[in-house]
A protein has these predicted regions:
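Conserved nucleotide-cofactor-binding alpha/beta core module
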Residues: 125-126
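Alpha-helix capping/helix-boundary segments
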Residues: 100-101
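Glycine-rich, positively charged N-terminal anion/phosphate-binding segment
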Residues: 38-54
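Surface-exposed amphipathic alpha-helical tracts and adjacent flexible/coil segments at the periphery
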Residues: 1-23, 27-34, 53, 59-69, ...
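Conserved phosphotransfer cores of two-component systems
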Residues: 109
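Beta/alpha (TIM)-barrel catalytic core signal, keyed to glycine-rich beta->alpha loops juxtaposed to Asp/Glu
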Residues: 121
Length: 414
């Protein structure tokens, strides 16, 4: 039997990092303020990165830092300076896609693994063997690979070389995220972390011609072209492999990667908890996993998501993998609070969404139980007065319920 896979979660800031670990992640990948292909994310300051590494290692978890831009000449000295810093704080690995950046990493990083980012578009075993010879420890394979292709890759590479694959989250409609649409429309390059997501915009086909017109640019027409690989500019469903943990493990994937460094705390907690439970159930009792699939599917839909697809894992996806009529998410539960403190009667938190005395809320426990409880009393901490609801963002509140949560538990709507 293949080994138990690593569960790898994204984190956009230190709070989501702690939540990811609390709810079951074995490792997290994060980005600094530069070089990480997520310019819109809050990202981690240098001090945050050090704190993240220290926190992860204190809790026997791993931390991977992204440095996966395609560097231009004016980035090189900054990359060198950044890697000197990473060499001090010692993350477990750095993710890289650019070979110049790889060369700098080999020169400057000691005791830090190099992982090849999915941006490198790795689709065959010869590439992976080449990266191993250069000194890489792991490759994040392209999303465009099927499980059969991944299985074949595993059969042609060293046992020491690890394969990481995205198994849940948003999918880029362009090949391995190498998109120029954002750069063309707005001057902001996806390959430098500035993607404005034109693939999610609404477009019209004018007068039944095969021309593309974006709503805000009625005078600009673009001919629609499609080849055997499909069209590159429409709205993809989200990837979800929660029903196929057995096939992922059988293919030999070493690390199950979740997309979403810009996703919410509730999303990270929900997805981490569901995949943690599914992986553990499968490893411990395959029948238990199969019997719980409906429960996993129900739970994974309690965070915000687009309709789900299995992507390329079972062959090239057809038109059902895209969403043609809208770009909206399906809304799940609302995040009310994350418990900061507990005493004999009350628990304390900073409000995330409004709720009221008398409401029934749900505690997301770490052991996969969803515990319904009624709000009996609510006190504004700053005024010390009883209130009927908490309508203000970041309002500091303590409440009494008939069941007490634990520190770090998430409170959400039913």
């Amino acid at each position: 039997m293949n080994k138990k896979p690593e569960l790898l979660l994204p984190a956009g800031d230190i709070n989501t990092l702690k939540i990811a670990f609390d709810y079951g992640a074995d490792a997290c990948y994060v980005g600094g303020e530069l070089y990480s292909l997520r310019a819109k994310a809050i990202n981690f300051s240098d001090n945050d990165l050090k704190q993240a590494v220290d926190f992860a290692h204190k809790h026997n978890k791993k931390i991977y830092i992204t440095a996966n831009i395609y560097a231009h000449n004016n980035d090189i000295e900054g990359v060198r300076e950044y890697f000197h810093f990473l060499n001090i704080i010692k993350p477990d690995a750095v993710l890289i896609s650019d070979m110049g950046v790889f060369s700098i990493a080999k020169e400057l990083l000691n005791g830090i693994d190099i992982h090849i980012s999915t941006q490198a578009n790795t689709t065959n075993y010869e590439s992976i063997n080449f990266y191993e010879k250069l000194g890489a420890k792991r490759v994040v394979v392209a999303r465009e690979l099927s499980l059969n292709e991944i299985r074949e890759i595993k059969n042609h590479i060293s046992e020491n070389m690890e394969i990481e694959a995205f198994i849940h989250g948003s999918m880029c409609i362009s090949y391995s995220g190498r998109c120029l649409l954002s750069s063309f429309f707005t001057g902001k390059s996806a390959n430098l972390g500035e993607c404005t997501h034109p693939c999610r915009w609404k477009y019209d086909i004018k007068d039944k011609e095969f021309d593309l017109i974006e709503n805000e640019r009625p005078d600009e027409k673009f001919s629609i072209m499609e080849n055997e690989r499909g069209t590159y500019i429409f709205n993809s469903k989200d990837l979800c492999m929660i029903e196929h943990i057995d096939d992922l493990i059988d293919a030999g994937i070493d690390s199950f990667k979740i997309e979403g460094r810009m996703k919410s705390e509730l999303y990270i907690a929900t997805v981490a908890r569901v995949y943690r439970k599914a992986i553990d159930d499968y490893i411990n009792d395959k029948n238990l996993y199969k019997n719980n699939i409906d429960k996993y599917k129900e739970e994974i839909k309690k965070c915000t998501y687009r309709e789900y697809t299995t992507g390329f894992f079972y062959g090239y996806p057809n038109e059902t993998a895209q969403i043609y009529d809208n770009n909206t998410y399906v809304s799940g539960a609302k995040l009310y609070a994350i418990v900061d403190k507990v005493d004999n009667e009350y628990f304390y938190f900073e409000q995330k969404n409004k709720f009221s005395v008398g409401d029934t809320v749900e505690i997301m426990s770490k052991n996969f139980d969803n515990i319904k409880t009624k709000v009996l009393e609510m006190i504004d901490i700053e005024t010390g007065k009883n209130v009927d609801s908490c309508p203000h963002s970041k309002q500091k509140i303590k409440i009494k319920t008939d069941i007490m949560p634990k520190i770090g538990d998430i409170i959400r709507s039913i």
